Amino acid sequence: MEEFKGYLEKGGFKQQHFLYPLLFQEYIYALAYDQGLNVNASTFNEPVEISGYDKKYSSLLVKRLIKRLYQQNSLIHSVNNAKQNRFVGHNKNFYYQMISEGFSIVVEIPFSLRLISSLKEKKEIPKYQNLRSIHSIFSFLEDKFAHLNYISDILIPYPVHLEKLIQILQCWIQDVPTLHLLRLFFHDYHNWSNDITITTNKSTYGFSKDNARLYRFLYNSYVVECESIFVFLRKSSSYLQSTSFGPLLERTHFYGKMKDIGIISCNDFQKPLGLFKDPFMHYVRYQGKSIIASRGTHLLLKKWKSYFLNLWQCHFHFWSQPSRIHINQFAHFSFYFLGYLSSVEMNPSSMKSQMLENSFLIDTVTPKFQTLIAIIPMIGSLARAKFCNLSGNPISKPVWTDLSDSEIIDRFGRLCRNISHYYSGSSKKQSLYRIKYILRLSCARTLARKHKTTVRTFLQRLGSEFFEEFFMEEEKVLSLMLARTSYPLHQLYREPIWYLDIIRINDLVNHL
């Protein structure tokens, strides 16, 4: 990174003005690909050694690719054939994938340097541990959402027009050749001439798979543009102006989170004061779904809904259905988020109070944030993975019957432990037990099918030790965590336990 910084700061010019020359540096592609170039030399109609180092991307090869992209641009548009997929004997997809990887590395450099410089401004860079965990979101929800009144469930809209993405990047990157190459790249890739949809559907599956890094960067740029208003509103919600406010940027590996305590200063005070910034709304997002919760009234949420609709229609130039934003009262609503069905449960309780000779009962209601497993979508995921049918009845896994018995048991056991690990924060464990039952019986059916016998006969032959693979690891972890407590293990196992080492959602619940 220091090498990039020195290159970008040559001549005292701004960093974002000199991104295009970096596309011709070989070490850019060495960063993009840790492994060598696993492509036959015949792809280039020339030996790889002539292009540069053996099994490496070279600046000479990159120059030729970009030159051919520009030269063939008019030919491609004149032919206008959607099935045409090659540049005069060269694989078109490979050209685009190679350029996109280099572009992704280069375009992230200004943002990486900006983030590093913002961290270096502080005297001490705090070591945030486990803050990148997905489960850290639920800790925030438990602390904040239980005391709020209304919640708005939002699906971030799509599609985003191609030129709008270019305009968003143009605000941050002033290197015209880089933006021009990106525009050319989009217009040519699979003959895209209308829209790029920021979603995981069939039309963009190929693009998001072949150009995952560029796809994530563009998606984050679009989301940051949508969320930029929150920085202004959070500043405005404070009575005194903050001396500093961190940028609202999302990164794959972020270094910290916004704090609720802001240090402020004012001429009327001799010392800096700590102002608790308790805004009128709380905002949480994961992928394409976001949650806004407020302590205010229903009218306030309706104003927010109107604002978002106007923002998407006027700024991003596309129509967004009002039905994509739902406003509900927290006490009567459950929302899906990160594979959990979350809600606020009101727990009534009575307390006896005595004053002098009179005693009376005081009825109180305590809100508690509940997180349940969304069992129906989870069973649907298991059914698509061929572990059960749509009714939740376990079935065998035919594609694994060629594996050894130990490998089959290990795969089922590892999957069961991962799901138990992720859903350990569930308030009620009945759904988790059902999922483990499906996986255990599916494992038994798979082994019985492999050995051409019945499940009953197979289980009688193996005995009770067969299912230890599905229990022992989790029980050991829990016993180590809760060894110092005086409560029995089975009682504490019913309580939510958030593991802060989970950085991605389980593959089986990616659709939520």
From Swiss-Prot:
Record's keyword annotation contains Plastid: yes
Keywords: Chloroplast, mRNA processing, Plastid, RNA-binding, tRNA processing
Cellular localization per UniProt: Plastid, Chloroplast
CC terms in the record's Gene Ontology section: chloroplast
Sample GO molecular function, one term: RNA binding
One Pfam family, short name: MatK_N
First-listed, main subcellular location of the protein, grouped into a coarse class: plastid
Annotated GO biological process: mRNA processing; RNA splicing; tRNA processing
InterPro entries, per database record: Domain_X (IPR024937), Maturase_MatK (IPR002866), Maturase_MatK_N (IPR024942)
Function: Usually encoded in the trnK tRNA gene intron. Probably assists in splicing its own and other chloroplast group II introns.
Similarity comment: Belongs to the intron maturase 2 family. MatK subfamily.
Annotated protein name in UniProt: Maturase K
Phylogenetic placement of the source organism: Eukaryota, Viridiplantae, Streptophyta, Embryophyta, Tracheophyta
